[in-house]
Amino acid sequence: RIADLKAAGWYSGDVHVHANLFAQDLIKPADVLAVGRAEDLNVLNILPCNDPRTTLISDLQFFTGGPDPVSDENHIVYYNEEMRNDLYGHVGFLNLKTFVEPAYFGFPHSPHPYDAPGNFPQVEAAKRQGAFVSYVHPGLPSEFPIDIALGLADTIDVMSQVDERNSLPM
């Protein structure tokens, strides 16, 4: 390594991981930890979210409201949440104690087919429990300017793994 960032007080992490979204095999917390160790990541935030083709919320069975028991002194595996609406934007909730429901809305084939109530109530519910709120997937339509103005959004992604051309000009 060129530098020992941990010795300088820095920790590496990935705050937007989907372990089992579209996965063919079940990826368990120990598997996530193994990948994190291989990538030298100290913090792994897994974001359970809805599969847009079904009503399944991937990884919800691993949500505990705190670091997963596989975590150790150098690695934190934490199942949190990505709340999704394709009109208002996708939002990552980190440091959750309780999963925020509904976790998605505006998907016509689901129990939550309409674009209501908007992201604000879910974001507010996450903040009440001490969550860090991050708007993810730049380029999607989003209500993040409103939530930022109201003091509810902590950050927004500026780059996405799926749309680099539209992310970079932002």
Outline where the language-model segments fall.
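Extended, charged catalytic domains and RNA/DNA-binding interfaces, predominantly
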Residues: 1-170
